């Protein structure tokens, strides 16, 4: 008889519970299989004689996880209520401010002409186009972020438990439609009350319908996810709907059949939308158990990355989260990259490949080109302020969409450092692809502005002189440093932020605000002069020099640090 101690038993004497291993002794190398005799598992010291309880329900597991998180959070119920109150108040105040601004803008807009001018677009048609674009953007975002996912700790523990997965995933499945419904209601109410001057029961029905349609869109994405449809296909479907919005606007302008008013939704339509949303919600709930763990982990990871980027005001990380969520794992067509003849051309070719493979950024370029065109063909928006805002937003969208290669290089600079190129030269080469993209955008956007203000060739010439500013601003924003978290923090509804975060976020847009002054003045005066074009060329040169700088800090800050170092050295 050979005695076997329990694991962790430090006593040298034999345990009374023994196992008959046969006549042969057991050496240090372990017994041979033939020497082991039959034994009862109840006598095995590694398997205790314990009573097995019932498997807990999914709801109890969720509650246990929540209690454990609260126990280690270090926050009281009062602080939680304070945070919720602050967040809700901030959201309500923000919506009211936006609603007030849009209402003032709607009152300041000139009335529509009594007879619709050929080639124009009515304000109700513009609202319909914007809502269609919002539906496409929502579907694309839902596809990229899941929409149902499990965060890292939940995916590691919950998904492996022998319980009904439906009960574990119900809160995550309900979170997306609820957030989309709130956002959809806010957008529809702002557009209806601000631009179309709707009020009363009509506004209430429109807000409810907007909330239900937004929830239906997210639920459709969840149904597709439960049926094994790849997230990339859902995102591509949303991108196609988003591209269809400017196409519909162009078709309305060319045909001249633009509606003068949108039909007011009835209570029957609202009830029908609610029934559809309820049926889709029941279908999603019934299929939650069929969701594969891989898609849940990918969706949860992308959503966590996106939320962290929004809270930290990092647009680059947000773009990576949205792009990586629907990136293709392989490509059917492989380019031979014949344009890569050296380090410089290889860098430019890589940026072109990144832009070509990102459908989201190609769609962003198309939408950016349509904004100034829409602003010039809508009679109520064809004003100085409307055209200026459309050019500003559209130009920044086009430049930012084409600088994805620079943003990836900022995250992983090892490839750039392997090239025999100076850091300044690398940043200037990164401006080539944004410059080409903005050049194409300029021909369309500034051509439309030229038709609106007169002398299209002069406006296109001014826009070509401003192309380097857009490219330099996009590259400067891509290479901006991360906020310094060792500085004093400022409490905000979204959490604590360092004091210099706004200064970091402003890197890139600051060049657009300053170095495009001739373009802004020309739009304000509705004319282009030789002095404006000359000044724009000079400021474009300055923008390229600033955008290619490798210093993370500004000139004034560097001078102050040098003075401090001199004082310390003199002391």
Task: Please give the residue ranges for each predicted region.
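Hydrophobic alpha-helical transmembrane segments of membrane proteins
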Residues: 2-9, 13, 17-19, 27-155, ...
């Amino acid at each position: 008889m050979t005695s076997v101690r329990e694991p962790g038993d430090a006593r040298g004497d034999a345990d009374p519970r023994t196992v008959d291993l046969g006549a042969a002794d057991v050496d240090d190398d372990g017994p041979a299989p033939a020497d082991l005799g039959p034994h009862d598992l109840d006598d095995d010291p590694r398997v205790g004689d314990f009573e097995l309880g019932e498997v807990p329900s999914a709801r109890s597991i969720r509650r246990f996880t929540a209690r454990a998180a609260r126990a280690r959070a270090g926050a009281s119920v009062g602080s939680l209520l304070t945070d919720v109150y602050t967040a809700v108040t901030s959201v309500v105040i923000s919506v009211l401010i936006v609603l007030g601004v849009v209402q003032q803008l709607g009152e300041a807009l000139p009335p529509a002409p009594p007879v619709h001018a050929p080639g124009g677009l009515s304000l109700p048609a513009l609202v319909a186009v914007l809502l269609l674009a919002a539906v496409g953007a929502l579907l694309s975002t839902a596809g990229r972020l899941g929409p149902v996912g499990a965060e890292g700790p939940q995916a590691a523990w919950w998904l492996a438990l022998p319980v009904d997965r439906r009960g574990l995933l119900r809160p995550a499945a309900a979170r997306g439609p609820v957030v989309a419904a709130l956002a959809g209601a806010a957008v529809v109410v702002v557009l209806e009350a601000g631009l179309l001057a709707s009020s009363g029961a009509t506004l209430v029905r429109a807000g409810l319908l907007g909330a239900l349609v937004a929830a239906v869109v997210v639920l459709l994405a969840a149904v597709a996810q439960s049926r094994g449809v790849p997230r990339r296909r859902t995102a591509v479907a949303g991108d196609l709907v988003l591209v269809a919005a400017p196409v519909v606007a162009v078709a309305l302008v060319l045909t001249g059949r633009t509606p003068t008013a949108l039909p007011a939704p009835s209570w029957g339509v609202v009830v029908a939308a609610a029934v559809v949303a309820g049926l889709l919600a029941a279908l999603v709930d019934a299929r939650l158990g069929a969701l594969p763990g891989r898609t849940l982990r990918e969706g949860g990871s992308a959503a966590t990355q996106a939320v962290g980027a929004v809270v930290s005001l990092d647009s680059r990380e947000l773009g990576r989260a949205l792009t990586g969520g629907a990136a293709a794992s392989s490509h059917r067509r492989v380019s031979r990259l014949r344009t890569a003849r050296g380090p410089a051309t290889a860098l430019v070719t890589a940026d072109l490949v990144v832009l070509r493979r990102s459908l989201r950024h190609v769609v962003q370029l198309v939408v950016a080109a349509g904004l100034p065109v829409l602003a010039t063909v809508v009679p109520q928006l064809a004003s100085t302020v409307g055209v200026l805002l459309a050019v500003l937003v559209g130009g920044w969208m086009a430049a930012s969409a084409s600088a994805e290669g620079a943003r990836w290089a900022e995250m992983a600079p090892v490839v750039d450092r392997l090239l025999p190129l100076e850091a300044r030269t690398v940043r200037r080469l990164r401006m080539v692809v944004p410059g080409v993209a903005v050049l194409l955008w300029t021909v369309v956007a500034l051509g439309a502005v030229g038709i609106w203000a007169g002398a299209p060739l002069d406006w296109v010439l001014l826009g070509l002189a401003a192309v380097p500013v857009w490219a330099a601003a996009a590259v400067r924003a891509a290479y901006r440093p991360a906020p310094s978290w060792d500085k004093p923090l400022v409490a905000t509804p979204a959490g604590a932020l360092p004091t210099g975060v706004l200064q970091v976020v402003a890197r890139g847009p600051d060049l657009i605000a300053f170095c495009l002054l001739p373009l802004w003045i020309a739009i304000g005066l509705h004319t282009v002069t030789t002095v404006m074009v000359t000044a724009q060329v000079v400021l474009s040169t300055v923008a390229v020099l600033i955008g290619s700088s490798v210093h993370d800090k500004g000139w004034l800050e560097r001078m102050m640090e040098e003075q401090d170092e001199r004082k310390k050295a003199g002391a």
